A protein has these predicted regions:
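Long, contiguous binding/interaction regions
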Residues: 1-45, 49-163
Length: 163
């Protein structure tokens, strides 16, 4: 099962490396990884998307909590949460393809952020399934390049990750 693990850790050199090393040493796969500073400049928030049984996720959480730099660990998928991902996709857009791509981007609430004679660069934000559906909806042969951030998540309502 897919899990979104949110980790609050000290914002210092080597902290990210130790977390990634923990996953690697134990053979756990990281599907996506995002890291950014929080409202407290001394802390970073890491979002790890991984897969595994409940037992595996429990082991990952326990191992993460043992790292000195880790302040708090939460499996967001245990409760209500919001997940988003950003995708930039550059597509070939010539002739009648241009209007079709524009319509498809509009349907998926994407924005065309760069236009050249032969290409569109489209920005989409949403759940992984939405971004995957957009890729499925367009002609794959028109895709020139794709960049995705990976998942980021936050608990709903009063559920927060703070010290």
């Amino acid at each position: 099962m897919r899990h979104i693990i949110s980790v609050l850790l000290e914002n210092e050199a080597g902290a990210l490396s130790r977390v990634v090393g923990l996953f690697s040493a134990r053979g756990y796969n990281i599907e996506t990884l995002t890291v950014a500073p929080t409202e407290d400049a001394t802390l970073s928030r890491m979002t790890v998307v991984t897969t595994g049984s409940d037992d595996i996720i429990e082991q990952i959480t326990k191992h993460l909590n043992r790292l000195i730099e880790v302040v708090k660990v939460v499996d967001l998928t245990e409760g209500q949460h919001i997940e988003r991902e950003l995708m930039l996709i550059k597509v070939r857009a010539v002739g009648k393809e241009r209007e079709e791509l524009k319509r498809t981007a509009d349907i998926f609430r994407g924005r065309i952020i760069d236009v050249t004679e032969k290409t569109y660069t489209i920005e989409l934000t949403g759940a992984k399934t939405k971004l995957d559906a957009f890729i499925d909806a367009i002609d794959r042969s028109s895709i020139l390049e794709t960049v995705r951030t990976g998942g980021s998540g936050i608990g709903r309502g009063e559920r927060i990750l703070k010290v």
